[in-house]
């Protein structure tokens, strides 16, 4: 498959690690680079992890600690054997003159490595994210070169990552003086209440869109219409009594799980206190 047909999907933990490495950089370092880890399947490069590679850039050369990069990769393979090298990342919003030299090294580590740039300056209040592949240019028997060509990049996340991002959003807009250092997970019933409230607001938004389309206030979108039709067909057909019975049964199961978890927590706390009691 051609490198130009690749699509890059980046997980949130990768961006967090890039920002953390940028914040911990040396005072004389203007750019931070590192290795991207993940997998490639059917033209999709999924980046699930990364690590920083110490380096120094001079006017005419680049010095990178390649032995450190190999050691970090070997350690990561022991934890997650499914992750392999898929490219490299760098902070900044542009490709520099040294990028081709660094990319040449990663081209020996994997096929069609991708180059990810993360703009940590937050210009415009957003973190710029771009992905590139290097295309070889030249004529047979003549001079050759390479050109970094942009490819599509998008953010994706697993369900636990989405849940963590929602917890982080609770601290957005809070002043640093009043910002909590920890955000504990909500109780199960509180999660159900919040999810129900959000579901209700989304349903109201859908109803408003449908009413506006019927009243010819909004131009209908066929893609949205197909998604709404699929959503309606996915709803199980049952009577109100059947739904109430099923809902009450699930609530009883949830309450039983909460009760048992609280009992186990109390037993563990009691066992901890008994362990530290002085013996006669």
UniProtKB/Swiss-Prot annotation:
GO molecular function: metal-dependent deubiquitinase activity; translation initiation factor activity; translation initiation factor binding
GO terms of biological process kind: antibacterial innate immune response; defense response to Gram-negative bacterium; formation of cytoplasmic translation initiation complex; positive regulation of Notch signaling pathway; positive regulation of peptidoglycan recognition protein signaling pathway
Main location: cytoplasm
Cysteine disulfide links: none
Pfam families: JAB (PF01398), MitMem_reg (PF13012)
Residue ranges annotated for the MPN domain, each copy included: 8-138
Gene3D superfamilies associated with the record: Cytidine Deaminase, domain 2
Source organism superkingdom: Eukaryota
InterPro entries: eIF3f, EIF3F/CSN6-like_C, JAMM/MPN+_dom, MPN
Subunit structure as annotated in this protein's UniProt entry: Component of the eukaryotic translation initiation factor 3 (eIF-3) complex. The eIF-3 complex interacts with pix.
Known role: Component of the eukaryotic translation initiation factor 3 (eIF-3) complex, which is involved in protein synthesis of a specialized repertoire of mRNAs and, together with other initiation factors, stimulates binding of mRNA and methionyl-tRNAi to the 40S ribosome. The eIF-3 complex specifically targets and initiates translation of a subset of mRNAs involved in cell proliferation.
Record HAMAP family: eIF3f (MF_03005)
UniProt-recorded name of the protein: Eukaryotic translation initiation factor 3 subunit F-1
Native species: Drosophila virilis
């Amino acid at each position: 498959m051609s490198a130009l047909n690749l699509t890059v999907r980046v997980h949130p933990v990768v961006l967090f690690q890039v920002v953390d490495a940028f914040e911990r950089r040396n005072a004389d370092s203007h750019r931070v680079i590192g290795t991207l880890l993940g997998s490639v399947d059917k033209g999709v490069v999924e980046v699930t992890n990364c690590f920083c590679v110490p380096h120094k850039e001079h006017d005419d050369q680049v010095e990178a600690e390649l032995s450190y990069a190999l050691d970090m990769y070997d350690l990561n393979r022991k934890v997650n054997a499914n992750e392999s090298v898929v490219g490299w990342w760098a902070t900044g919003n542009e490709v520099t003159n040294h990028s081709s030299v660094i990319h040449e090294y990663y081209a020996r580590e994997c096929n069609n490595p991708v180059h990810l740039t993360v703009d940590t300056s937050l210009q415009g209040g957003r973190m710029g994210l771009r992905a590139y592949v290097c295309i070889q240019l030249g004529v047979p028997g003549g001079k050759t070169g390479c050109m970094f060509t942009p490819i599509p990049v998008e953010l994706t996340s697993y369900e636990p990552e989405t849940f963590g991002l929602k917890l982080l959003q609770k601290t957005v807009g809070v002043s640093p003086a009043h910002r909590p250092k920890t955000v504990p997970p909500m109780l199960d019933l509180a999660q159900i209440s919040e999810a129900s409230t959000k579901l209700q607001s989304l349903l109201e938004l859908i109803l408003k869109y449908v009413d506006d389309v019927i009243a010819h206030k909004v131009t209908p979108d066929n893609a949205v219409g197909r998604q709404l039709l699929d959503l309606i067909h996915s709803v199980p057909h049952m009577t109100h009594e059947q739904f109430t019975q099923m809902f009450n049964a699930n609530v009883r199961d949830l309450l039983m799980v909460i009760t048992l978890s609280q009992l186990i927590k109390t037993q563990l706390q009691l066992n901890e206190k008994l362990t530290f009691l002085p013996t006669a």
